[in-house]
From Swiss-Prot:
It is found in: Cytoplasm. Keywords: Cytoplasm, Isomerase, Porphyrin biosynthesis, Pyridoxal phosphate. It catalyses: (S)-4-amino-5-oxopentanoate = 5-aminolevulinate. It is an enzyme of class 5 (isomerase). This is Glutamate-1-semialdehyde 2,1-aminomutase. One of its GO terms (molecular function) is transaminase activity. Belongs to the class-III pyridoxal-phosphate-dependent aminotransferase family. HemL subfamily. Homodimer. Its EC number is 5.4.3.8. PANTHER family: GLUTAMATE-1-SEMIALDEHYDE 2,1-AMINOMUTASE, GLUTAMATE-1-SEMIALDEHYDE 2,1-AMINOMUTASE 1, CHLOROPLASTIC-RELATED. It comes from Laribacter hongkongensis (strain HLHK9). GO terms for cellular component: cytoplasm. GO terms for biological process: protoporphyrinogen IX biosynthetic process. The gene is hemL.
Length: 425
């Protein structure tokens, strides 16, 4: 039994399932998870001192790579002055100003401590602003683990959702309608029937929790048009895509200005942070100005803010996103070509520094299509890549991430490993 296995067995005695977030347990792919002891740049080292080329990047935040010197220095300097105050600070004004500058749809922004907290608060705010209860989300999209969003589709159109987790009362989900991603006709029919009841629509503007799925231009335009026509709030959940797919987030790629935006991951530079913001008239409904309550002991934590602000400044360097997108495309194109050489049905897609790999002949456009891909073959591929020192997401339904620290040599080594893995499976 290696050190990783020993730690996993030890963890299971004191931590449910041995992990603090389910996907880390390798339940989808089998085997024992890797316990990471340190990371630098594009690499992580596990408990057995095996170096891994990392394509998870803490599930998105590490856009600069691990332990970037400028971010580490910012954290160290902030920590010297105190870890938490429970008061306003000048630094939180600075990061708020930076967010508003980079995302013009955000006129006011509130800091929180996680992406889940951001989406939960945005939903509450939209309901308070509109005076309505019903919300729309889309099949396969993940918006954190708050009760009203842990919902699966009902039995038919206009049937409100059912809980997708034990412990969530049906009353929490009876106002949540789950529709198909990229289905414009279904969206139009729903608004025609109950548009006056819909408080908000929340969307992953590039879905990253059913692997990577792009929205069609017609779909996002229909969302913007219908929500405006019916007085509903359009929420872009950019916890994953914000500052990851483009400097202005996915909304800058779509040419769409949502009413509210949720952020996390990159905005914290690897530290726990989240944010939600948008139109001033909506944000002014939040306490202490308005009647929608939201609060947090660690909101605006000075150490997290320091990491986030350092990251936001670095990603504004000229050419940063062009280089990141080119490197990500090089990875995806190389892996698709390697699969083609092996005669394996396989496709890939990428947006900015996010990518998706699918054991299917064509890039999927919906939850149904992505779940129809060959999961068993993915699992075999995942383990072959892991043995070769490449750390991909341990699930066929999660996006991957490239950082600015990945080099062409890292990409080439990954493609070579994939070529050997495809030959084995």
């Amino acid at each position: 039994m290696d050190r990783n296995q020993q730690l996993f067995e030890r963890a299971k005695h004191v931590i449910p399932g041995g992990v603090n977030s389910p996907v880390r347990a390798f339940g989808s792919v089998g085997g024992s998870p890797r316990f990471i002891k340190r990371a630098q740049g594009a690499y992580m080292w596990d408990a057995d001192d095996r170096r891994l080329i990392d394509y998870i990047g803490s599930w998105g935040p590490m856009i600069l790579g691990h332990a970037h010197p400028a971010v580490v220095e910012a954290v160290q300097q902030a920590a010297v002055h105190g870890l938490s105050f429970g008061t306003p600070t000048e630094a939180e004004i600075g990061i708020a100003e930076e967010i508003c500058k980079l995302m013009p749809s955000i006129e006011r922004v509130r800091l929180v401590s996680s992406g889940t907290e951001a989406t939960m608060s945005a939903i509450r705010l939209a309901r308070g602003f509109t005076g309505r209860d019903a919300i729309i989300k889309f099949e396969g999209c993940y918006h954190g683990h708050s009760d009203s969003l842990l919902v699966k589709a009902g039995s038919g159109l206009l049937t409100f959702g059912n809980p997708s987790s034990a412990g969530v009362p049906e009353d929490f989900t009876r106002h949540t309608l789950v529709l198909e991603y990229n289905n414009v006709e279904q969206l139009e029919r729903t608004f025609a029937e109950i548009g006056e009841r819909i408080a908000c629509v929340i969307l992953e503007p590039v879905a990253g929790n059913m692997n990577l799925i792009r929205p069609s231009a017609a779909f996002v335009q229909a969302l913007r048009t219908l929500t405006q026509q019916h007085g509903s709030v359009l929420i872009y959940d950019e916890v994953m895509t914000g500052f990851r797919v483009a400097l202005g987030g996915a909304q800058s790629l779509h040419g769409i200005q949502p009413d509210l935006t949720t952020l996390g991951k990159v905005v914290g530079g690897g530290m726990p942070i989240g944010a939600f913001g948008g139109r001033a008239d909506i944000m002014n409904c939040i306490a202490p100005l308005g009647s929608v309550y939201q609060a947090g002991t660690l909101s605006g934590n000075p150490v997290a803010v320091a990491a986030g602000l350092a990251t936001l400044r670095l990603i504004q360097q000229p050419g940063f996103y062009d280089a990141l997108a080119a490197r990500t495309a090089r990875l995806v194109d190389g892996m698709v070509a390697a699969a083609r050489e092996a005669g394996i049905p396989f496709s890939g897609d990428c947006v900015g520094g996010m990518f998706g790999l699918y054991f299917a002949a064509d890039v999927p456009t919906s939850y149904a299509e992505v779940t129809a891909s060959d999961r068993e073959r993915f699992n075999a591929f995942f383990h072959a890549m892991l043995e070769a020192g490449v750390y991909l997401a341990p699930s066929a339904y999660e996006a991957g991430f490239v950082s600015a620290a990945h080099t062409d040599a890292d990409i080439d080594a990954t493609v070579d490993a994939a070529r050997q893995a495809f030959a084995r499976i």
